[in-house]
């Protein structure tokens, strides 16, 4: 590495360099002898020493021209006000490289942050390499960032904020007295002198309080070590988790169908059946293993003709087994096709038979007749019933109709009619109520229906002929959505007529022809 010295310029520059902020001058680091003396250390000057005034500027080579042996670093994006600001002192040409302290340490004055002063050693060897022996003493606590930044004073000034706090954590663990602090009052006095004069502008794109997005080398080292330890601990815990797992239970064998034909046995099995009884009779205390050995020896000594007899029996049993197996599989296929059909055909009769059983009365004719007349007396009820229980049979499904006097007369012709004054007041009341309830759904349908039946049908014949059971209330689900009820309530669709009723409903006018009533005869529930 060559050392270059540059003479001072003839004329002073117009302005200081851009990175130097505020009235404080900036010490140009390119003119220092980087290997001044036998200790091969360089040092930053202390605040009590003289500095070059801000009006003096010297041209220097770019950083790329210097051949530094520096590990690759990624300087964080810190605001410019975090750089070291030096005090302005009297003008004059002095040596830019000042003598260092006796212990080879350079003082690092952190400006604009409440941290004690930190001194970091520049550990450059004679051959330009880093002295890693002092750093390898405590790799877990100290980091090599100090050596990376200390190869150049400006790089040391660009050290992240978190680094002084990291070094300050365990001062007792740092060897060779590499960590020293000053009094808090002295630090505050220095900070007051440097910061009290003027407001420092922020030229950095990041705000003053922003933190570096790039992790410092120290944090990355500690994170790598933490990851290694977590991997080791995780590796130790894995066998325990594997041991904690329960062994898989063997799958249960499917139960064999008793109708399935059994597979035929081999010729040796047939011979074993025949001879086993004889051997057991001779040796009752013989175990199964001993019996099998005796049978095997007898099978080996058996003649070929006798073996063929057993083999023929086995072949005949195989043919019979194949026939039985084909018939068994055909029966399984036929059952698989017939079972779903039986289920589908058996369901509709159950539904049809269960629905009419809800209605009870002394006469099916009367109950059916009153049911139809009650539906016509309360046309506002029809959208509710069709929406709540759409699966009712067609003869039970309500039919909207506005012809109230006709339907009442049909109901009254079957039995003795009650006085008209008893029916008409509740009838008009419910007609007015039903105009608003399909849209608002103020009451559940299960609560509306019994009240309407009791209030609309006051005559004893009505109460005898049609009695609403609690089972019917369960069929009508009161929790259906109001949207379905509203959409069906808005559609006043009748057979051959789509005219909606006028808002002041006049039941004597504005209704369709009475042709729709020709089908509204007595409905019998079957």
From Swiss-Prot:
Q: Where is this region: Disordered?
A: 138-178, 192-264
Q: Name one GO cellular component term.
A: nucleus
The record's comment on protein family reads: Belongs to the high motility group (HMG) box superfamily.
Query: Tell me, what is one Gene Ontology molecular-function annotation carried by this entry?
Result: chromatin DNA binding
Query: Biased-composition ranges for Basic residues?
Result: 246-256
In terms of PROSITE patterns, this protein maps to: HMG_BOX_2
Name the SMART domains for this protein.
HMG (SM00398)
- Recorded source organism is Homo sapiens
- Give the location of motif Nuclear localization signal in residue numbers: 237-256
What does the record note on quaternary structure? Interacts with HBO1 complex composed at least of KAT7/HBO1, ING4, MEAF6, and JADE2; this complex is involved in histone acetylation. Interacts with DNMT1, LEO1, PAF1, SAP130 and SIN3A; these interactors regulate chromatin remodeling. Interacts with an array of proteins involved in RNA processing and translation and DNA replication.
Where in the cell is the protein located? Nucleus
Q: What is the lineage of its organism?
A: Eukaryota, Metazoa, Chordata, Craniata, Vertebrata
State what protein this is by name.
Answer: Thymocyte selection-associated high mobility group box protein TOX
Comp. bias intervals (Basic and acidic residues): 228-245
């Amino acid at each position: 590495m060559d050392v270059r010295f540059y003479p001072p310029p003839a004329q002073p520059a117009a302005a200081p360099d851009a990175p130097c902020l505020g009235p404080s001058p900036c010490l140009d680091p390119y003119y220092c002898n980087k290997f001044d003396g036998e200790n091969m250390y360089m040092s930053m000057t202390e605040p009590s020493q003289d500095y070059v005034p801000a009006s003096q500027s010297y041209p220097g080579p770019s950083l790329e021209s210097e051949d530094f042996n520096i590990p690759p670093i990624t300087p964080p994006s810190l605001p410019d006000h975090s750089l070291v600001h030096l005090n302005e002192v009297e003008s004059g040409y002095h040596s830019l490289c000042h003598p260092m302290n006796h212990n080879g340490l350079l003082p690092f004055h952190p400006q604009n942050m409440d941290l004690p002063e930190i001194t970091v050693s520049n550990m450059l060897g004679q051959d330009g390499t880093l002295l890693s022996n002092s750093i390898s003493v405590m790799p877990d606590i100290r980091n090599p960032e100090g050596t990376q930044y200390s190869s150049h004073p400006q790089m040391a000034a660009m050290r992240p904020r978190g680094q002084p706090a990291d070094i300050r954590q365990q001062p007792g663990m740092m060897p060779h007295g590499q960590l020293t602090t000053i009094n808090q009052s002295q630090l505050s006095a220095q900070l007051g002198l440097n910061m009290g004069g003027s407001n420092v502008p922020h030229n950095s794109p990041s705000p003053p309080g922003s933190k570096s997005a790039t992790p410092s080398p120290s944090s990355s080292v500690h994170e790598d070590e933490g990851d290694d330890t977590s991997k080791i601990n995780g590796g130790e815990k894995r066998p325990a988790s594997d041991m904690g797992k329960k062994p898989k239970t063997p799958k249960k064998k499917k139960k064999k169908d008793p109708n399935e034909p059994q597979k035929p046995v081999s010729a040796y099995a047939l011979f074993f059946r025949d001879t086993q009884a004889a051997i057991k009779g001779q040796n009752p205390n013989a175990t199964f293993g001993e019996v099998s050995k005796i049978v095997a020896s007898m099978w080996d000594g058996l003649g070929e003709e006798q073996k063929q007899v057993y083999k023929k029996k086995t072949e005949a049993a195989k043919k019979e087994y194949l026939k039985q197996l084909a018939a068994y599989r055909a029966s399984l296929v036929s059952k698989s096709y017939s079972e779903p059909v039986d289920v589908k055909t058996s369901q509709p009769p159950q539904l049809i038979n269960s629905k009419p059983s809800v209605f009870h009365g002394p006469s099916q004719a009367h109950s059916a007749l009153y049911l139809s007349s009650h539906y016509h007396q309360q046309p506002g009820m029809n959208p509710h019933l069709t929406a709540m229980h759409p699966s009712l049979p067609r003869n039970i499904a309500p039919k909207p109709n506005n012809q109230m006097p006709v339907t009442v007369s049909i109901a009254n012709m079957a039995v003795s009619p009650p006085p008209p004054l008893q029916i008409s007041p509740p009838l008009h009341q419910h007609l007015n109520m039903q105009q608003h309830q399909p849209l608002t759904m103020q009451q559940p349908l299960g609560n509306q229906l019994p009240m309407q039946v009791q209030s609309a049908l006051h005559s004893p014949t009505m109460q005898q002929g049609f009695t609403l059971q609690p089972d019917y209330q369960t069929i009508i689900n009161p929790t259906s959505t109001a949207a379905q009820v509203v959409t069906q309530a808005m559609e006043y669709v009748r057979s051959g007529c789509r005219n909606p009723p006028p808002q002041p409903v006049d039941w004597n006018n504005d209704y369709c022809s009475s042709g729709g009533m020709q089908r509204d005869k007595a409905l019998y529930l079957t």
